Amino acid sequence: LSPSSAASDVYKRQAPLALTYKAINTMDSMLGYKNERYLYFGRVPAKLDDVANYIPSRLAGLLWVAAAAFTHNDAKGAWKIWRRDRRRHASPNSAQTESACAGALGVQLAGPAYYFGEYYAKPTIGDPLRPIEPEDILRANRMMYVASAFALAWGVAIRTVL
């Protein structure tokens, strides 16, 4: 096999998986609501999305802890809050990166919210060591970029070995 045909074979195997993942993710976004209209029909894509993102979300949480150290944020705080609060959400995957970010920044995130005009009491994530400020958006973005670079490097390394 030539290098180009070998690469083509890899893409042919991966494309259906990527499309399946995207379909699951989109169905969850559109139908995975816990309201009367979608409660039963939306449960399947919501659970499939939980399964599909179980490992990636945890790896992403760890990458955010590492990114905190490289962006001069509080890596120890990120680790502590990630370990403590990563399960403080109705979805098993949603608080993984959010908790690491909250710990790295020393802020409290989440909490009560309104959806479709209805109040929902939700747990907070992180400790309110200081008030949230606009600069935190830039700090979180930097951590996101560094965590993404780590994930890309990790993927390239795995792909090179395999």
Protein language model features and the residues they cover:
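Membrane-proximal soluble regions of multi-pass membrane proteins
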Residues: N35-E135
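Juxtamembrane boundary at the C-terminal end of a transmembrane helix
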Residues: V156-L162
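Single conserved hydrophobic/aromatic residue that forms the stacking wall/gate
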Residues: L1-A7, Y11
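Hydrophobic alpha-helical transmembrane segments of multipass membrane transporters and ion channels
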Residues: S8, V146-A153
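Active-site His/Glu-centered metal-binding helix of metallohydrolases
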Residues: A23, M27, L31
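C-terminal binding/interaction regions
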Residues: A140
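Membrane-embedded alpha-helical segments that form the functional core of polytopic membrane enzymes
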Residues: K12-I24
